[in-house]
């Protein structure tokens, strides 16, 4: 009897890898070795970028707050310091959302910060 090397187990494993590599360019979605190598790299990128996403959102929020604060005659750092002195306990995500969606409320917050700085 001939020897069966792996058989269904190997086929299932390779099929699983190629299914995960669906949508990759070139031979990376066809050839098992190229696909498994690319999957390894893709998982590394995914892990790294899950961590990076947090700082990228923080940068976006700060940019939005800064732009809105400058329209109201303050810099970002003075705005944040003024809000802290005034006892306004809002995080950057909330402030950025207000700056983006509700200009009147943000202007009121900017006035509060200005009064606290004076």
From Swiss-Prot:
Keywords: Ribonucleoprotein, Ribosomal protein, RNA-binding, rRNA-binding. GO terms for molecular function: rRNA binding; structural constituent of ribosome. GO terms for cellular component: ribonucleoprotein complex; ribosome. It holds the Pfam family Ribosomal_L20. One of its GO terms (biological process) is translation. Binds directly to 23S ribosomal RNA and is necessary for the in vitro assembly process of the 50S ribosomal subunit. It is not involved in the protein synthesizing functions of that subunit. Belongs to the bacterial ribosomal protein bL20 family. This is Large ribosomal subunit protein bL20. It comes from Lactobacillus delbrueckii subsp. bulgaricus (strain ATCC BAA-365 / Lb-18).
